[in-house]
């Protein structure tokens, strides 16, 4: 009799297990991240600067060092995600770009300054550290600095969405020469920066980025 009872309990237990669903409940669903790319370029309409009463136009030999660091993306609740140089990066680093890298046939070149995994949701702004240090134009080498009371990290309002398995690309446009105001023997850099475009790409570019990064 005892043996029969044990067998009966085992059958009930097996029936219970078979009736349980193994599907993951919706409340435990974890969405796949998307990618955010941030590019920066200079405005092709801003190509001349007046130095000591003489107008100088941009040339392929000119340069302006622009230090970029500490990128963040803020969602609608003001929570932020840290931006990295590439999806293989494991820490934030500083990078310097020649923001007036000019090609006579094509205009200013652009630079990919961030490429990061981000949770899929709506975002409202970026913050990026942007500091110019020196301009080499014609025969001149001119030091550049931010205004004394201005922080190096710049807030950039921009509404955008990151979706699962997709890529969001933001391009920023800087007016390098219009941003500069002469002060004694140097120039103050006021960072006239705007959002040039926000573009969205599907899973094809997402897969390409992963393939090129050698991530699993």
Give, region by region, the residue ranges found by the protein language model.
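Sec-dependent bacterial lipoprotein signal peptides
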Residues: 1-18
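A short, solvent-exposed, low-complexity linear motif enriched for acidic/polar residues
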Residues: 21-216
């Amino acid at each position: 009799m005892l043996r029969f009872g044990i067998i009966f309990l085992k059958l009930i237990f097996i029936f219970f297990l078979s009736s349980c669903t193994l599907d993951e409940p919706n409340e435990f669903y974890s969405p796949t991240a998307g990618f955010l790319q941030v590019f920066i370029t200079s405005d092709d309409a801003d190509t001349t600067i007046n130095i000591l009463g003489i107008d100088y136009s941009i040339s392929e030999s000119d340069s302006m060092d622009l230090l970029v660091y500490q990128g963040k993306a803020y969602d609608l609740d003001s929570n932020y995600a840290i931006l990295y140089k590439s999806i293989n990066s494991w820490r934030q680093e500083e990078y310097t770009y020649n923001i007036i890298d000019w090609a006579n046939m094509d205009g200013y070149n652009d630079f990919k300054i961030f490429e990061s995994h981000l949770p899929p949701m709506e975002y409202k702004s970026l913050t990026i550290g942007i500091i110019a240090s020196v301009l080499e134009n014609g025969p001149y080498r001119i030091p550049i600095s931010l205004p004394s009371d201005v922080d190096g990290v710049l807030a950039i309002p921009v509404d955008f969405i990151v979706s699962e398995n997709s890529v969001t690309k933001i391009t920023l446009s800087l007016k390098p020469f219009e941003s500069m105001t002469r002060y004694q023997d140097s120039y103050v850099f006021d960072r006239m920066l705007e959002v040039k475009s926000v573009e969205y790409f599907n899973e094809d570019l997402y897969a390409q980025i992963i393939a090129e990064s050698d991530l699993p």
